[in-house]
Amino acid sequence: MPIAADTIKYGPWTMGVRYDLPPEDIGPNGLQDMLNTRLTQSAGIEKVLGTKSYENAAALAGTPTVTACGQFRVPSTGAERVFIVAGAAMYYYNSGWTDITGSVTITAGDDNTFEWVRAFDTLVLTNGVDAPIKWSGTGNAAVLDVDSRFTTADHVAFFDNRVWMANTNADEDRVWYSDAGDPETWGASSFYNLGSPVRGLQPLQNALAIHTEDFIAV
């Protein structure tokens, strides 16, 4: 015969994981421990997928910190290039990781993360610590020519057929832009002063959003 019982409900886990409380003090919306799982934004639980070597490639010597990772398509040839910056070197995958650092200086550091964009057939990267880098998808990487307008830049975007860079070593509130169609020609007056440190650049359809500490300019 049927047994009268209460429904047992699990989640949503809005209380989160409370490692600081004994299990008996945690309500039905809380967790005491988790393993290989994580909470979603809607307070659900999903499995952590973990990591796997790309194409089963051997690990880089010394296990350096990866500060850039992406897939770069060269439109003129259709070539697809998977690249990483790890430690003080840049690599792309070609039946194994091939070092393409060349003469470029890359300062290793856990916080020296790169932003990158594709500008026509050129990959452009910047980390705010070293000179901006370019790579064509073949050969070695090289320093991007910015006509000595600045030395480093924190942020980069590609919009209106121009490369945009912001928060440079000289002016944290300034946004520079290259000539249309030429990522390596930068006019002496090709910049905007925002009056507030720039914290990000994001193309939005027909506009470029410039995020500063105090406002967003479009």
List the predicted regions and their residue ranges.
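Beta-propeller fold detector
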Residues: 99-104, 142-147, 187-188
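Short coil/turn segments at the loop-to-beta-strand junctions that recur within blades
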Residues: 104-110, 147-153, 195
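N-terminal beta-propeller domains
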Residues: 1-98, 151-218
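Hydrophobic or amphipathic alpha-helical targeting/insertion segments
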Residues: 111-146
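A broadly used, surface-exposed interaction patch
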Residues: 96-119
